[in-house]
Amino acid sequence: MLDYYTTWVKLCFLWGTGEDEQDGYDPKGKQWALGGDTWVVGCKIPPEAVVFPEFNDLNPDEHDPRYNTEHGVYAPHCGLDELMFAWGHDEYMYRMLVANNTAIPREGLDIIRYHSAYPWHDRGAYKHLMKPEDEQRLEWVQLFNKFDLYTKDEGNDLRGNFTEDLWPYYKGLCEKYGLGGKLKW
């Protein structure tokens, strides 16, 4: 299913390089722009969505009847497209790509948007909000995540002076998928 020779997949991996480059990370900086798991907002936060669910009680939404039920503001099986996710780097990049009418196919956009939604694709949360056609989207994200951030081999650290060598190739990929020139950010 995930063909390494499919060029748009390479752009999905390229998108994640910002997380690799945060060695000098400043905790006072804009961490939301670099990494972090995401979850659905507008409904009860399931315990499997966060590392320390005992802190969910500190969230005002936990006490708001509009948001503190299993479905919250959503209809059962409304589908992924109807859900709002916590804002982060994934959602930002997804919206930027859509705003620029990228030619990256739906599968690639789903990978970018949902790959940090670990409660959904890794822990089985939100199935009650999925449409049947969302199952294939789940398969794509799960397949991609086998090769993503947390599974990288530290022995294959590609940081260094590769930019000049790789720039022409990736610039060509960006142009192929409608991301050359000026972009709407």
Regions found by a protein language model. Name each.
Residues 1-164:
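Divalent metal-dependent catalytic cores for phosphoryl transfer on phosphate-bearing substrates
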Residues 167-185:
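C-terminal helix/juxtamembrane-tail motif
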